[in-house]
Amino acid sequence: MSDDFIDKEEQNEENIPTPENGHLDYKPADTKNTGVKHQLSGMYQNWFLDYASYVILERAVPHINDGLKPVQRRILHSMKRLDDGRYNKVANIVGHTMQFHPHGDASIGDALVQLGQKDLLIDCQGNWGNILTGDGAAAPRYIEARLSKFALDVVFNPKTTEWQASYDGRNKEPITLPVKFPLLLAQGVEGIAVGLSSKILPHNFNELCDASIAYLRGEEFKLYPDFQTGGSIDVSRYNDGERGGMVKVRAKINKIDNKTLSIAEVPFGKTVPGVCDSIVKASEKGKIKIRKVEDLTSEKVEILVHLAPGVSSDKTLDALYAFTDCEVSISPNCCVIDEKKPHFLTVSAVLKKATDNTLSLLRQELEIHKGELLENLHFASLEKIFIEERIYKEVKFEQSENTDAACEFIDERLTPFYPQFIREVTKEDILKLLDIKMARILKFNKDKADENIARIKEQIEEINNHLAHIVEYTIDWYQMLKDKYGKQYPRRTELRNFDTIEAAKVVEANEKLYINREEGFIGTALKKDEFIAN
């Protein structure tokens, strides 16, 4: 046995006590002896837990506050830093993101393409691939991206963002982004961690806004998935997106004539080539009777299924759903990170959390803006008195020996006016008065100064009203988002209750029964003999 390790028998011989659970905590190596010794069980137990925790918290599972995985958050943060209104090369965005994400350019590039294909946060230019056909995006040096207007409206605000040091300590990155929208439910997510996974289906933009408004009003709401690929969905067992639920998604199939079926939309997660292959394989196995499959997909999905002579199109339709990728079952698993731990929630709980978070962020923004306006009002009042009273022209001020003496004199002259100010006058305020240029003093107009002060007071009053009615203000926010962006996101997936298709009956219906009366044979392969029934 190697000198580098000892097993449990040797450990017991050395009279090292073993805990009741049979595991040892990992201990530093014993460097007193010539050989380095580790205790295997403790080492692997601790290291595996560290690895599992890292993958769960830092790689695969989204955070409930902003609905983003770390790599997505870092991409958006980098794009905001690069943002000047113009498109940036994806290769440049990937390189910039590597300042914050230590896992290489490939993972960043793939995550960026997935974000772009969801058509919500990123405005894309160039060949970004096709989720319908499964075609990949062009090389990063050929495609460009910038933040969408929606992302700029709802995702960023440095004043309400909590920051942390990046992995190498050279930069700051957001702990979570201040997203004022249920982004996690709009985009959906899929991630496989160690010991758990997360699969949240995407939902409709307008329905999310309506649900948030209903929640704020204390009304009931229901949310069901909506997919970019369209199709139809049976949500009777959705179970609010919780573990154990399931949805069935079907392709949209139209009957052109008795001999031809047309597939116009494919199920979520499937591609046109994949659906075509599944139909061909089902045909080869004798599950369905078709003559050929023709893929005419370009901008829109168009798959023509040409039926064999004498085959019923209605029965073939059922067989396509039963034996091909024209129908798929999806099991959601709503797992998110909250307070540095994974939690399994319902879709409704996620929306409520996101809506509460939005309300909190809007309140913070109002309070920050109010504080800035109060500072502006305070200094505008100081400036008005400083210039109107011509304090800067007084002999004692002009003969001040130094800045401290000048500040002391100004403070003394302002003392009678203290009741007019909204807060105490500080030395920093007086130093700002000393920084006023003569050109500004010469252009001073009392009426304009009074108008400016009145306008600031009016804005403060408006903010106070919003803070007093913060729920109504948040409802108006969601309504604004719906009015501004909702037309781009109509529901694409039809909600339906599917009839149960029994595979055995469908196969039987696709078989024809023949009989050879002379030889006494009966079966489905005697196609030259007398036809009896389907």
Residue locations for each model-derived region?
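C-terminal interaction appendages of subunits in large macromolecular complexes
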Residues: S2-L24, T31-G35, L40, V189-I192, ...
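Catalytic phosphate-handling regions of large nucleic-acid enzymes and associated NTPases
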Residues: S2-G244, L304
